[in-house]
C-alpha cells in the first residue's frame, strides 16, 4: 500500500490491515443450537430506532446482528485467545485489532486522496417476505447507505465533511475520495455507530419498522417488544466462519439471541442468579459479592466504565454557570475522593474522563496535569465558598438538574452530590426522567441548567469533539469556543499519531481546566456469565457499541447447562 498509507504510518485510518482469520485458541469443539439470553450493557434501555438515518447512538447495538459493516473487530486478538485486546471499549478499535467484514481488502491511493475497497463476493441479503427477494450484496449498497446517512436531516454536524464522494467503480469495488487526511475515516463509516449496510429495499419498505429489517449478518430480527425484548434468529445462509484449532465452523452457533430489557436492577440481577439470563454484561459493584456467594459458578470480567459521569452546567444561557469561578467552585465542593472510597468502596477511578486510561498516549494521568486541573479533584469547600463569593454568590444559589431514572447508579449518586453542594449554599432540585424524555431534552436543547449524565468516551478524538465542539448533539453544557473548535479540527487532520496524541492531551487539559462539568469518578463495572457460555471471555464490543460478531461466535453447552440444574 502506498500514498496515504505511507503518510499515515501508525495512524488509525492508515493502519487498517488486510483481513485476518478469526482463530479461537480452544480445543473444545463447538456445539450448535439453543438460545442465548442476554442482559446487555444497556439492559434497562429498549431499542430507540431501527433506522440508521435517525443517527441514534444505540442503533448499532440493536441492528449489528443483521446489518454488517465494512470493518469490524478482529476477535482473534481477544485476550482469551492469547491476544492483547479486551474488546470492551465502546467505540475504539486499535489499528492492530481491525479486520475486514464486508470488505475483503483495501488500498490507499493519492491524487486524488482515496481508498479503494474490494468487497467480498457472494454475500447475500436473504429473502424477506414483503420487502425483498434474496440477492447479492454489492458496491451500490455501500454507496446507497452512505449517501442516505449523509443526506439525513438528523446527521451529526460535520460528520462526513471530510469525504468528497463515494462511488461504486464496479460491482464489488467502492471508492471513498477524501478532501484531506482524517484520523477517524474508518470509524465514521467503516465500523461506526451508523455504519451498517442497509439495502434500498428496506428503506423503500420503511426502515424504521423493525418488521422490514434484513441484512447480511449472522442473525435476523424476528421479534421486538418495546420495553421487553429483541429476538434475533440464526441466518442459515450466513457467509462467515470461525476457525477453532485446525477446523473452520460455520457461524452462528446458537439458533437464537434474545436481548432482555429489564428496567429494575434487582430483577435483572435475580435473572442472572437463577439462570434466566446466560450473560449479564453490566453489574454494579454493589451486587458482585452477593452474586459470587449465591452463584459461585459464574465467570467474571471487571472493566472500567466506558463513559464518564458528570453534572453538566449549561454555559449557553444566562446564569451563574457563565462564570468559570462558579464552575470551579462546584467542583471543589464535591469530595470526589470520598465518593471513590465510601460510595464506590474503591471500585472507581478518581480521574478517567474525558480521556480513558485505556487510550494509551492520549491519556494523561491526574498527577501529570497542571495544578489548576488537579485542584478541581481535591475537596476544598472553603475555597469553593470564596470563589462563589467572588463571583457574586456569597449565599449560593439553586438550580434544577435532570437525571435519567434508567441509571440506578445516578439515582443514588446525584443526591450525594447535592448534599456536598448544599454545604456551600448551592441547592439542587432533582428531576428524574425516563430515558426517552431525558435524551430528548438534550437533543432539543430544552434541558435544565444542570444535566446529570454519563457520556461514552467513544474514542480519543470523538470524546472531545462530541462533548465540547460548538453545535454538537452530545454537548450538554453548550460549550462553544471557536479557537477550541479550530484546534480540534487540526487534530483530526494531523496524520502523525504521536503529534495527534500531544494535541489531544492539550485539548483535554484545557477543557478540564475550564470545567463545564462537575467531573466525577468513573466506576468499575462487572460482567458475568454462566460456564455453559462457551467461546467467550467478557468481550462487549466488536465495533461501535456493536456486539453482534461476538454473539455469533458463542455457543451454549446445553448438556452442561442441564447438568448444572438449569
Located regions from the model:
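Detector for C-terminal structural segments
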Residues: 40, 44-46, 55-65, 225-230, ...
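Extracellular/periplasmic solute-recognition and catalytic clefts
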Residues: 165-166, 222-233, 260-318, 337, ...
Amino acid at each position: 500500500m502506498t500514498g496515504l498509507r505511507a503518510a499515515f504510518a501508525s495512524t488509525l485510518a492508515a493502519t487498517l490491515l488486510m483481513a485476518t482469520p478469526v482463530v479461537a485458541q480452544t480445543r473444545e469443539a463447538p456445539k450448535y443450537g439453543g438460545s442465548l439470553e442476554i442482559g446487555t450493557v444497556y439492559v434497562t434501555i429498549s431499542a430507540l430506532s431501527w433506522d440508521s438515518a435517525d443517527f441514534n447512538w444505540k442503533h448499532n447495538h440493536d441492528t449489528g446482528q443483521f446489518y454488517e459493516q465494512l470493518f469490524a473487530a478482529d476477535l482473534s486478538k481477544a485476550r482469551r485467545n492469547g491476544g492483547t485486546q479486551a474488546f470492551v471499549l465502546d467505540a475504539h478499535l486499535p489499528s492492530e485489532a481491525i479486520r475486514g467484514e464486508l470488505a475483503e481488502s483495501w488500498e490507499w491511493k493519492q491524487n486524488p486522496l482515496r481508498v479503494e475497497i474490494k468487497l467480498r463476493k457472494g454475500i447475500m441479503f436473504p429473502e424477506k417476505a414483503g420487502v425483498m427477494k434474496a440477492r447479492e450484496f454489492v458496491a451500490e449498497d455501500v454507496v446507497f447507505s452512505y449517501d442516505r446517512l449523509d443526506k439525513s436531516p438528523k446527521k451529526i454536524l460535520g460528520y462526513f465533511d471530510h469525504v468528497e464522494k463515494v462511488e461504486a467503480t464496479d460491482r464489488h469495488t467502492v471508492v471513498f475520495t477524501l478532501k484531506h487526511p482524517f484520523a477517524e475515516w474508518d470509524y465514521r463509516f467503516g465500523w461506526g455507530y451508523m455504519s451498517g449496510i442497509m439495502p434500498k429495499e428496506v428503506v423503500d419498505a420503511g426502515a424504521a419498522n423493525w418488521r422490514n429489517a434484513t441484512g447480511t449478518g449472522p442473525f435476523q430480527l424476528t421479534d421486538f417488544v418495546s420495553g421487553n425484548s429483541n429476538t434475533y434468529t440464526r441466518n442459515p445462509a450466513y457467509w462467515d466462519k470461525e476457525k477453532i484449532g485446525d477446523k473452520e465452523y460455520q457461524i452462528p452457533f446458537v439458533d437464537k439471541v434474545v436481548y432482555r430489557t429489564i428496567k429494575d436492577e434487582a430483577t435483572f440481577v435475580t435473572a442472572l442468579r437463577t439462570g434466566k439470563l446466560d450473560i449479564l454484561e453490566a453489574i454494579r459493584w454493589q451486587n458482585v459479592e452477593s452474586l459470587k456467594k449465591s452463584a459461585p459458578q459464574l465467570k467474571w470480567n471487571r472493566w472500567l466504565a466506558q463513559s464518564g459521569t458528570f453534572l453538566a452546567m449549561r454555559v449557553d444561557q444566562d446564569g451563574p454557570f457563565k462564570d468559570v469561578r462558579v464552575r470551579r467552585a462546584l467542583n471543589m465542593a464535591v469530595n470526589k475522593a470520598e465518593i471513590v472510597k465510601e460510595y464506590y468502596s474503591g471500585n472507581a477511578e478518581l480521574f478517567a474522563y474525558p480521556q480513558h486510561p485505556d487510550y494509551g498516549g492520549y491519556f494523561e494521568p491526574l498527577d501529570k496535569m497542571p495544578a489548576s486541573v488537579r485542584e478541581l479533584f481535591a475537596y476544598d469547600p472553603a475555597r469553593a465558598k470564596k470563589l462563589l463569593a467572588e463571583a457574586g454568590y456569597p449565599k449560593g444559589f439553586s438550580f434544577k438538574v435532570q437525571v435519567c431514572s434508567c441509571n440506578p447508579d445516578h439515582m443514588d449518586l446525584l443526591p450525594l452530590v447535592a448534599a456536598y453542594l448544599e454545604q456551600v449554599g448551592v441547592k439542587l432540585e432533582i428531576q428524574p426522567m425516563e430515558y426517552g424524555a431525558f435524551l430528548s431534552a438534550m437533543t432539543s436543547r430544552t434541558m435544565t441548567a444542570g444535566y446529570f449524565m454519563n457520556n461514552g468516551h467513544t474514542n480519543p478524538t470523538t470524546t472531545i469533539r462530541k462533548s465540547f465542539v460548538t453545535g454538537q448533539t452530545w454537548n450538554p453544557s453548550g460549550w462553544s469556543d471557536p479557537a477550541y473548535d479550530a484546534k480540534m479540527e487540526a487534530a483530526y487532520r494531523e496524520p502523525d499519531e504521536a503529534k495527534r496524541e500531544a494535541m489531544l492531551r492539550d485539548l483535554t487539559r484545557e477543557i478540564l481546566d475550564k470545567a463545564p462539568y462537575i467531573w466525577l469518578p468513573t466506576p468499575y463495572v462487572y460482567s458475568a456469565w454462566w460456564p455453559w457460555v462457551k467461546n467467550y471471555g467478557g468481550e462487549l464490543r466488536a465495533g461501535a457499541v456493536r456486539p453482534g460478531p461476538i454473539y455469533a461466535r458463542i455457543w451454549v453447552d446445553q448438556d452442561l447447562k442441564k447438568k448444572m440444574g438449569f
